[in-house]
Amino acid sequence: MKGKHEMTKFNLKTIQQTPSDIDKSIVLIGMPGIANVGKLCISSLIDALSATKVAEVFCSDFPPQVLVEPDGLLYVPRTTIYHSRLEDGGTKDLFFITGDYQPTTSIGVYEFADYLAKKCAEEFKAELVIATAAFVRDNLTEVPHVFISSTSQETLELFIEADKTELFKNGTVTGANGIIPAMAAALYDIAGVCCLGETAPVLQSDPRAARAIIEVLNQTLHISSDVTKLTPFLDELIKEIEPVFREAKNQLDMDKMRDQTRDQPYIS
């Protein structure tokens, strides 16, 4: 046996120690959700930047099931944390958090959010927590916009300056992708922002929306001088799902036209 572990609400498995000289960092989060927009976004950045896996978090409030991989091996669902240090234009430490599931209960989501927000504050020395997720519409657009909300006016203005962004107001962001940045601000005095890519729930995955978010992140954070270096994974997916996207868009457009026709008053 490699060691004994008592299962608690959260079990942390350290893969590699984070650099000891981190002065401040930015944390980017993308948990599974509608059209997997957030997870696709963060997974693409992790891959493009060759980020290093530093930790895994196991949560007792995840769905009670394990995943079976293509080779037949069992895999326990987890949240995974990665780190990347960018040196161009000065040192910039980025942490990425994504995973297989979100907690299944309201209490679980809040406890999970607090656990990660505290880690962002105390271990990662985060000055900004960015959550990526989906903004649900009843139609699909050729060029998705990114809807921005934030815990501070200063951060909001910074992100809303990027191309193809809109202010998100008078609504809710459900789940960990909304609660983590909000809780980081409320309890740990870390600025938080939500970047929500425009999509429709008919899609199981939407790399277009994820790519739109990465374009906004790159304009704001200056991650790369060439945004296409951050999106090869998504660009390939976009090509693969093009027929699915076209079919879904046409169906939604027809449904909308029928609804508009049905709503027109009869005039004689």
What is each model feature region?
Residues 36-40, 107-111, 115, 175, ...:
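Conserved active-site and cofactor/substrate-binding residues in soluble primary-metabolism enzymes
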Residues 55, 95-97, 128-130, 191-196:
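Hydrophobic/aromatic beta-strand patches that form the interior of the parallel beta-sheet core
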Residues 137-220, 260, 266:
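Catalytic cores of processing enzymes, dominated by hydrolases/peptidases
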Residues 52, 115-129, 186-191, 223-225:
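Secondary-structure boundary elements
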